[in-house]
Structure formats: C-alpha cells, structure tokens
C-alpha cells in the first residue's frame, strides 16, 4: 500500500469514528430530557390546580424547536424546584387541552403561564426564555412575589392557524376554532 492510500484509509476510519461519537453523544444527551419523557412525568393539570402549590404550565408541542431547545433547562428547574412548584405540560396538538389553549390565548409556543397557589394566572411568558429568567420567575412564584420577567416574549414556534374539522381528535388542529 502506498503512503497516500494508508493516509486516506486512516482519515476514513477517523471520520467514521468521529461521526459515530457525535451521533451517540446527541442521542445520550436528548434521551434523558426529551419533551415526551418530561411530559409523562409532569404533574397533571387537575392535580396542580388542587394541591395548593404554585404552578408553571408549559404549552408545548413535540415538533417545537424552541420547546426542544429549552428541555434541558426545564429538566434542571424541575429537579431543583419540583418539591415546591408544580410543572404541568400541555401539548397543543392534543385537543383535550383546547379549553386551556383558548383560555390562555396560546398562539405561539412554548407558552408559559405562572399560576399562584390558588390556580390564578398571575403572569405569562412566551417563547424561548433563558434559564436565569425562568429561575428568577419561579423563585418569585414560590416566594409569592411579583414575577420579575412577566409578559416577556422570546423566539417561538407558531401554532398554526387551522380550523377544527368535523373530527375534533385531529392532532394538528391546534385548538383553533372554526371561523364564523
């Protein structure tokens, strides 16, 4: 074998090894913090509204890139504040949550609604929020203080404006009512 062929073979092996390492790294990173996994472990909204603790309601969708980007930060917040704050997650693609989508006027996601310990909405923020902002808001929520970053808007994934067809179980209706 010539030196050029040896070099090319080594480069090919290194490229394959690096590609595999990067792929496995991303798979490992996202498995523990996926939106689906967090949603399955989230407090049901009915429980959150009745247990006397303040609540952060997150409206999300699995396809929402902003929601996916925030998943690690929210997992950290849930770990640190889960004993004093309910974390409820409502998927906008599930028509079950249509009343809540309409009540809180969700038209972009992620959409966060801060509820006091009586279940009253006291603030909201829409779009990607830095961990520091979310943490300060949650700290204020627990302390019964004004939410410092209320009504802040960051980058969002738009909830598509679609009408509800005759079959209300359509997963892509996004809860928008049929125009009159």
From Swiss-Prot:
Going by the UniProt record, its keywords in alphabetical order are: Cell membrane, Disulfide bond, Membrane, Redox-active center, Transmembrane, Transmembrane helix
The UniProt entry, under InterPro entries, shows: Thioredoxin-like_sf (IPR036249), Thioredoxin_CS (IPR017937), Thioredoxin_domain (IPR013766), TxlA/HCF164 (IPR044241)
- Give the record's GO CC terms: plasma membrane
State the protein's purpose: Required for disulfide bond formation in some proteins. Acts by transferring its disulfide bond to other proteins and is reduced in the process.
Task: Output the superkingdom of the source species.
Answer: Bacteria
Q: Which residues cross the membrane?
A: 10-26
SUPFAM superfamilies referenced in this protein's UniProt entry, alphabetically: Thioredoxin-like
Name-wise, this protein is Thiol:disulfide interchange protein TxlA homolog
**Per the similarity annotation, which family is this?**
Belongs to the thioredoxin family.
Which pairs of positions does the record mark as disulfide bonds? 64-67
Q: Which residues form the Thioredoxin domain?
A: 34-143
Where it sits in the cell: the answer is: Cell membrane
Molecular function (GO) terms listed?
A: oxidoreductase activity, acting on a sulfur group of donors, disulfide as acceptor
Q: How does it sit in the membrane?
A: Single-pass membrane protein
